[in-house]
């Protein structure tokens, strides 16, 4: 499988 999705980091 590919890499897991990155968590959303707000600006």
From Swiss-Prot:
Top-level taxon: Eukaryota
GO MF entries: peptidase inhibitor activity; toxin activity
Family from the record: Belongs to the bradykinin-potentiating peptide family.
Residues found modified as Pyrrolidone carboxylic acid: 1
Keyword line: Hypotensive agent, Metalloenzyme inhibitor, Metalloprotease inhibitor, Protease inhibitor, Pyrrolidone carboxylic acid, Secreted, Toxin
Organism whose genome encodes this protein: Gloydius halys (Chinese water mocassin)
Job description of the protein: This peptide both inhibits the activity of the angiotensin-converting enzyme (ACE) and enhances the action of bradykinin by inhibiting the peptidases that inactivate it. It acts as an indirect hypotensive agent.
Cellular compartment(s): Secreted
Gene Ontology biological-process annotations: regulation of blood pressure
Main location: secreted
Listed name of the protein: Bradykinin-potentiating peptide 2
Tissue specificity as recorded in UniProt: Expressed by the venom gland.
An annotated GO cellular component: extracellular region
